[in-house]
Design a protein with these regions (language model features):
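RNA-binding accessory domains that recognize and position tRNA/RNA substrates
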Residues: 1-15, 23-79, 140, 188-193, ...
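Generic secondary-structure signature for well-ordered alpha-helical cores
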Residues: 60-68, 108-116, 163-167, 186-187
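Active-site adenylate/phosphate-handling loop in enzymes that bind or generate adenylated species
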Residues: 1-6, 88-160, 164-165, 217, ...
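A short alpha-helix-loop-beta-strand transition element characteristic
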Residues: 166-174
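Flexible, glycine/charged-enriched surface loops at secondary-structure junctions
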Residues: 65-73, 115-116, 121, 175
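Generic beta-strand/beta-sheet core signal
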Residues: 39-41, 76-79, 120-121, 149, ...
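Small/polar glycine-rich anion-binding or flexible loop at a beta-alpha turn
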Residues: 124-126, 174-182
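Conserved G/P- and acidic residue-centered "switch" motifs that form tight phosphate/ATP-binding loops
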Residues: 19
Length: 245
């Protein structure tokens, strides 16, 4: 892989969506010496269990570059928070508020797991939630360091690295995650902070954020893992409970 020994820079929490960008960001972070744990916001049955299986398979790939060929994957049960957002937040701000909630959860989990930063696959201007104004409004909920290895990469470069590390074919499987399954037609590209804060007041989000953190399930993935969630249940929480039996 080259770069620095994994772990020499400390540990980071990778927000892994299942798309092209976040696994590449995880690979590049490891190349810079950051040991990675992954978190995934699963929203079954609003999303299919196959979308979470895709994430398991992506972790298998990037765990090959990890410190001990083993990587923690934290499955966050996001549906309980996802539904109130869809029900109460104006369409144009759904993604903004959803991402703010995700950052809150990621920060709490990162602190719980002794991580020094959050890592994600954001690339400036690539989608509505990744304009500078969006990043400013979303990032406001945390003072935790955010590492964005792909911040100034274009899609061609990202795709090239995904091919190189073997994640491309997995990432393009046609299963939507919680950020894309109910994507509004006209998401705000320059969301205002004061408006986002006002909209959040319609949700009892603090209790729901804590619930998501407390009910997160952790599994450990290696390059040789043969875990197939779809054989264990229709929802991720059910599948992980059955995995213990």
């Amino acid at each position: 892989m080259g770069g620095f020994p994994v772990g020499v820079a400390g540990k980071g929490m990778l927000m892994l969506s299942g798309g092209l960008d976040s696994p590449v960001a995880g690979y590049l972070a490891q190349k810079q010496g950051i040991e990675i744990e992954c978190l995934h916001f699963e929203s079954t049955p609003l999303t299919s269990i196959e979308s979470s299986q895709k994430v398991v398979d992506l972790v298998k790939s990037i765990s090959a570059y990890s410190k001990e060929n083993k990587m923690a994957l934290h499955m966050v049960p996001f549906k309980e928070l996802h539904m109130p957002i869809l029900d109460h937040i104006p369409d144009s701000y759904i993604i903004t508020i959803m991402r703010r909630m995700m950052y809150r959860i990621a920060t709490k989990l990162a602190l719980k797991r002794n991580c020094l930063c959050i890592v994600n696959g954001e690339s400036v201007g690539q989608v509505a939630s990744q304009t500078l104004q969006s990043m400013y409004t979303i990032n406001n909920v945390t003072n935790f360091p955010i590492i964005r290895p792909l911040a100034v990469y274009d899609k061609v470069d990202i795709v090239s690295i995904a091919h190189k590390i073997g994640t491309y074919e997995m990432s393009i499987r046609p299963f939507e995650d919680c950020c894309t399954v109910y994507l509004p037609k006209n998401p705000a590209t320059a969301p205002k902070l004061d408006r986002a804060i006002e909209y959040e007041k319609t949700i009892d989000y603090e209790a729901l954020v804590d619930w998501c953190v407390e009910n997160t399930k952790t599994i450990y993935i290696t390059p040789d893992s043969d875990l197939d969630l779809s054989l264990l249940g229709l929802e991720v929480r059910q599948a992980l409970e059955n995995l213990k039996k």
